[in-house]
Regions:
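An aromatic- and histidine-rich active-site surface loop
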Residues: 76-90, 94-127
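Conserved donor-binding/catalytic core segment of Leloir-type glycosyltransferases
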Residues: 8, 197-211
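N-terminal subdomain of nucleotide-sugar transferases
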Residues: 1-48, 92
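Membrane-proximal helix-turn-helix segments that form the acceptor-binding/catalytic region
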Residues: 87-90, 113, 137-155
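Nucleotide-sugar donor phosphate/pyrophosphate-binding loop at the beta->alpha transition
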Residues: 117, 127-147, 187-189
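A short, charged, and often flexible helix/loop element on the N-terminal side
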Residues: 60-87, 130-137
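A short helix/loop element that forms part of the nucleotide-sugar donor recognition site in Leloir-type
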Residues: 53-55, 186-198
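Carbohydrate-associated surface elements
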Residues: 161, 180
Length: 211
């Protein structure tokens, strides 16, 4: 019988729909668990947006969840949780450690030091975002990017632009794997009609966010 691949995952807040990374991790890990992988997600401590009853969920769709110590202060939550997740994954019995985002990748050298195979998924050039553009946060995230280049066995990027950036900046080969989407279930917009009195084909609905 073939032995299961043991995989540790961190970088997400928790398995929820709080953000893009969380959705990617949830969808990816759920499918990998269905395909026979043994997966542990190291989640950040703190309140789950879906309600307090979800804060300490141990298992989700075949995925083992563990909460790591977290300093719940602005600017420290992601750093502290990523550090402890890196330690846990380094000392745990895992074949692969999959790290999501540039900031958490700062600590990718820790599991690598303990002989783990490390994969880093770069969801975007976070250091260039407006909220991180200046100061310590930007420098930390940028160093995380450099550590991924230096220590990760494989790097996954989600866009051709970021793939080109890594090649031109670091001469580093990456794997371009864009995010997939679930086929939508088409439903009648009855709630919109009931609430706003708008009929089908009489309006345009735009959903988006500012980053």
């Amino acid at each position: 019988m073939e032995e299961k691949i043991r995989l540790a995952v961190f970088g997400q807040k928790r398995l929820s729909r709080e953000g893009g990374i969380e959705i990617v991790v949830k969808e990816l890990c759920t499918r990998m668990a269905q395909n026979g992988c043994d997966i542990t997600c190291y989640n950040r401590a703190g309140h789950h947006v879906s309600g307090a009853e979800y804060d300490k969920t141990i298992e989700y769709d075949g995925i083992r969840q563990k909460v790591v110590p977290t300093i719940e202060k602005k600017g420290l939550a992601a750093v502290s949780s990523s550090f402890f997740a890196a330690l846990c994954s380094a000392f745990g019995r895992y074949d692969v450690v999959h790290i999501h985002a540039e900031g958490p990748a700062f600590f990718c050298w820790i599991p690598k030091l303990f002989g783990k195979r490390v994969i880093s998924t770069i969801h975007g050039l976070d250091w260039a975002r407006e909220k991180w553009k200046f100061g310590v946060g930007s420098k930390f995230i940028r160093q995380g990017e450099k550590n991924a280049v230096k220590y990760a066995d494989e790097i996954i990027v989600l866009s051709k632009g970021v793939q080109k950036y890594f090649m031109e900046t670091y001469g580093r080969e990456t794997h371009f794997i864009p995010n997939g989407v679930n086929r939508p279930e088409v439903r009648e917009a009855k709630l919109i009609t009931d609430h706003f009195g708008l009929e089908k084909d009489s309006y345009i609905l735009f959903l988006g966010r500012l980053v």
